[in-house]
Amino acid sequence: MTDNIMSPLKSLPDGTFTHEQAEAVAAQYQNVAIEDDQGTHLRLVVRKDGEMVWRGWNFEPGGEYWLNRCIESHGIRKTQ
C-alpha cells in the first residue's frame, strides 16, 4: 500500500528564489502563502492560527535559510 506515502518536500534553494520556486513550496502547505506579489518581488509568509510566524522577501540575502527552517518547524503539510 503506497496510498499514505507522501512525496518528498521541496524547499527553497540557497540564495534568492523565484516565483515558481515559492509557488512550489507554498503548494505543499496549508499555512504557507505568497503575499505582496509584485511580479519580480514577492513575500513568502508562514502563519500559525492566522498569525504571521515568519516572512521573507524573495530577494532578501539569507531569507531562504530562515524561511526553510520556519516552514520545517511550523509548516502544516497538505494531505494528498
UniProtKB/Swiss-Prot annotation:
Gene3D superfamilies: ykff protein like domains. Keywords: Plasmid. It holds the Pfam family DUF905. InterPro entries: DUF905 (IPR009253), YkfF-like_sf (IPR038612). The keyword Phosphoprotein does not apply. The keyword RNA-binding does not apply. It comes from the Bacteria. Belongs to the UPF0401 family. This is UPF0401 protein YubL. The gene is yubL.
